[in-house]
Amino acid sequence: MLINFSKSKLIKIFKDELTIKGRFNEKSNIYDYKNWDSLANFNILLSIEKEFKIKFNSKEFSALNSFSDILKNVKKKD
């Protein structure tokens, strides 16, 4: 069950993990930010799991690499 989900919280996780000071582009993916590498993506997903009390399986961990894909996946877990 998805706990306390909001899109703004999800964006905050991305901004915190990627150390983005300004506006975050919701159409972004792993190739759009220099510091959004596989380790950062892993940390983003771990932070999302912790914040919203959900779990990603191993297939999701390797496939989710854009904000929109992650947003859709998180919403499906509700």
Outline where the language-model segments fall.
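Phosphopantetheine-dependent thiolation modules in NRPS/PKS and related acyl-activating systems
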Residues: L2-W36, A40-L46, E51-D78
